[in-house]
Structures are given as C-alpha cells and as structure tokens.
Amino acid sequence: MMSLIVKDLQRYPFHLVDPSPWPFVASFSALIILLGGVLYFHTYQGSLVILFFGIFFLLLIIFVWWRDVVRESTFEGNHTTMVQLGMRYGIMLFIFSEVILFIAFFWAFFHNSLIPALETGVVWPPKGIQFFSPWDIPFLNTIILLLSGCAVTWSHNCIISGFRRQAIFSLILTIGLALIFTIFQIYEYAIASFHLSDGAYGSTFFMITGLHGFHVIVGTFFLFVCMFRLVQYHFTMQHHYGFEAATWYWHFVDVVWLFLFVSIYWWGSF
C-alpha cells in the first residue's frame, strides 16, 4: 500500500499533460478555415458558409481547450513555478513567430514601394489610389491603442499590488478601447476608395492592416477571458501567468501598429 502511495506522488516540478484531442481538432478546423478562405477568394458559392463554420468550430475548440488549461492551473495546481517558466518561454517564442509573420508582409510592402513596378507607373502609391490621411482615423486609432496599452499595464500593476477593483476597471477600459479601435478600423475599410484586388498597394495594405486587426480581435478575446477569470478570483498577486501572457501579447499588438502607422500610413503616403 505504501509503495503505491509513493509511486503516485509527483516528485518533479513539471506538468505531464494528459492526452488531449484539442490540438488535432483545432488543426482540422484551421484547415476548414483555409479551405473556406481559398474558395471565397475564388468566388465559389457557399464558401462563406464553410469559412464561418470553420471559424465557429475553432472558437469552440479554443473555449474547451482554455477551459482545460484553467482547470489544470487554478483548480488542480499543476502550473508550478517551473511550468510557468516554460510557458513564459513558450509565449515569447510564439510572439517571435508572429513578428516573423509580420516581417514577411512588411517586406512585400517595402519591396513594392521602394522599387515600384512598371504596372504601378513607377510611382508609389500607384496612380489612381486615393490613400488615407495618416492624421485622421489612423492617428486616432494610434492614440486609442496606446491608451489601451497603458490601461492593461495599469491593470497588471493593480493585480500585483492587490487592488482588485482597480484591476477589473482598468481591464474593462482596455477591452472597451480595443472594441472602439476595431470599430474605427472597420469604418475605415468601409470608406476606402480601393480594395484588396487593386494591385500591390491594395493587397499589401489590406493584408497587413487586416492581419493586425485579426490580432487585435484575438487579443480582445484573450483580455475578455482574463477579465472573467479576474472576476472569479482566479488570479492572485503571485500567480497570474494568464494575464501576463495577455499583457505581453497586447503590447506586441501595440508595437506592430506603431510600425504599421509610421511605415504604411505616414511614410507610405508620400
């Protein structure tokens, strides 16, 4: 009996996760999204149904997967100091991979802008493109996103200091600013005089700003989950890795937007 008890005791600080179907199912839903997106760009009938089904399926998988992670961390106590250290390295590598992704699209933008092709009239922006003034909606969105970065840092410091109410308020403020940013970005797309298919400028502009907008939406969802967990007393002054990861991700979104504003809206309008 004693040998069984000793065998069951965990004598290492690492968390050996149980077999999970969520990685495989999530990759399958990502395949559905990719298929729906390709069919949509080729104007196939019913492609939007496939695309939105894949998005809904992926959101559902994210919900149940994060639910399992929260259970392992908050209720089972599996996220030791060593596990949290590994997760911090993981989110750093994830953000680094996101930086590489954005570099690829910015590379395409600078390649076309610094060496304009004959098809664009050897000028940049191409003739006929009525680009946005950087000091209208783009500048307003810059202020909004910087304020949201300050608000999420305020919330993080409040958690560390034990000021729970202030942490909840500042996190709600962050989410509100993120939603306002998204609304302004959608409005900017609606009034744009060019589209995704309008040459190199249209494709690079909408791909970069759209990719950033997608990350803003993901980050907003991330912060909303953190707000729910904060209300449910899941975070303490010492143990709040989930919130730290969301904060790092949101600051990454801020930095990308600053570079995007300077390179595409300001420098790209000359």
UniProtKB/Swiss-Prot annotation:
GO terms for cellular component: mitochondrial inner membrane. It catalyses: 4 Fe(II)-[cytochrome c] + O2 + 8 H(+)(in) = 4 Fe(III)-[cytochrome c] + 2 H2O + 4 H(+)(out). InterPro entries: Cyt_c/ubiquinol_Oxase_su3, Cyt_c_oxase_su3_dom, Cyt_c_oxidase-like_su3, Cyt_c_oxidase_su3-like_sf, Cyt_c_oxidase_su3_a-hlx. It is found in: Mitochondrion inner membrane. CDD domains: Cyt_c_Oxidase_III. Keywords: Membrane, Mitochondrion, Mitochondrion inner membrane, Translocase, Transmembrane, Transmembrane helix. The chain crosses the membrane at residues 21-41, 46-66, 90-110, 131-151, 167-187, 205-225, 248-268. GO terms for biological process: mitochondrial electron transport, cytochrome c to oxygen. SUPFAM superfamilies: Cytochrome c oxidase subunit III-like. Its EC number is 7.1.1.9. GO terms for molecular function: cytochrome-c oxidase activity. It is a multi-pass membrane protein. Component of the cytochrome c oxidase (complex IV, CIV), a multisubunit enzyme composed of a catalytic core of 3 subunits and several supernumerary subunits. The complex exists as a monomer or a dimer and forms supercomplexes (SCs) in the inner mitochondrial membrane with ubiquinol-cytochrome c oxidoreductase (cytochrome b-c1 complex, complex III, CIII). Component of the cytochrome c oxidase, the last enzyme in the mitochondrial electron transport chain which drives oxidative phosphorylation. The respiratory chain contains 3 multisubunit complexes succinate dehydrogenase (complex II, CII), ubiquinol-cytochrome c oxidoreductase (cytochrome b-c1 complex, complex III, CIII) and cytochrome c oxidase (complex IV, CIV), that cooperate to transfer electrons derived from NADH and succinate to molecular oxygen, creating an electrochemical gradient over the inner membrane that drives transmembrane transport and the ATP synthase. Belongs to the cytochrome c oxidase subunit 3 family. This is Cytochrome c oxidase subunit 3. It comes from Cyanidium caldarium (Red alga).
